[in-house]
Structure formats: structure tokens, C-alpha cells
Amino acid sequence: QYRSLSDGDGSWYSMRGNVDYQRTSKKNKDRMITLSYKISTQPQNSDYYTDYKDIKDPFEMDIVKKFLLNNSHSDGKTNTTEHTFQVDYTTPIGKLHTIEAGAKYIIRNNLSDNKLFEAEGVSDNYEYNNDRSSKYKHLNDILAAYLGYTLRYKTFSFKPGVRYEYTSQDVKYLAGAIGPEADFSTSYNDFVPSVTMGIKIGKTQNLRGGY
């Protein structure tokens, strides 16, 4: 028989910001370039204590060790920071053709640092428990680019395009039960072609198909 008391506090907030710049050609208003930058961050902190009180062991089972009734203190910090860079360009070619191109680069960093301190039984002499603690970084780099072409002739439109994506992941263990020997990196990429065709069959009706 025992009582457990938990007490702690935590904090969390989010910050976001962005800057955009767009330039349009003086000779052709349909020709433009757009530059964008975004940033976001979400830090979190937690600090908790768990204490065990009024422990009764009438059967001498040594329940403190058997059920791990050790006073503990956990200190956790996590944060995700993301930077996004993007460029988009559109230009008409003659009266029937339009070319679109763009790229996006995302840097996403995740950091987690969780420390656990345990006391011997119900004392307040806390010691760092490496086996129940962890600290690691998860780094992501994502690159995407696209190229599209549009043909518009009277009521008919034809739009083929292709999109490329590349992702790189890097995980590093900095402290705790899992050490640097478990670090790993991986990457992969994809090509995604697409095509869309459409025809206007009335003032308010359009027929469209895509792949």
C-alpha cells in the first residue's frame, strides 16, 4: 500500500514568420517571380516530480524495489525548428503557351532532451539515470522542384508537368541509453509526372481529365 504524488509544470509556445517578395515584368504582367521564406519554432519544456508516500509493506515483499517505487524527477526539453525557402517563376511564351517552374527547400530540425533522475527509495537524493534518459537530434532536408507547361487554344487546354522530390534524414543520439553507435542516415527521391487536359463545353461547364 502506498500513495504517489506528482507535481510539475510545463511550457509551450509557437513562433511563426514569413517574408514574401514578388516582381512582375513591366512588359508583360503575366511574367513574374516570387521569393518566399518561412520560419517556425515550437519549444516545449517540462519539469515533473513523482514522490511515493506512506509505503506499507506488511508482507515484507520489499515493494519499493519490486515495483520500482523510487522518487523521481524528469526534466524534458523538445524543439522543432523549420526553415522554408521557395521560388516560383511563371512566363508566357506567345499567346498560347505558359511555362511554370519552381523549387522549395525545407530544413527541419527536431531536438529532444529527456533526463530522468531517481532517488534511492523514497529519499530526495536524486541521481541521473542514464538508462532511462535520452537525447537525440532528427535532421530533415527536403528539396522539391517542379516544371510545367500549359497550352491554351480556344476552349482546349493541355498541361503536362513533372515534380521531383529529394529527402534526407539524419538521426544522431547524443546521450542516454541509446548511444552514437545507433546513429543513422537515409535518403530517397521521387519523380512524379502529371498531365491534365480540359475543354470548355459551355459558359459554366468544363470537362477535365488528368493523370
Locate predicted features:
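Primarily recognizes Gram-negative and organellar outer-membrane beta-barrels
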Residues: 1-211
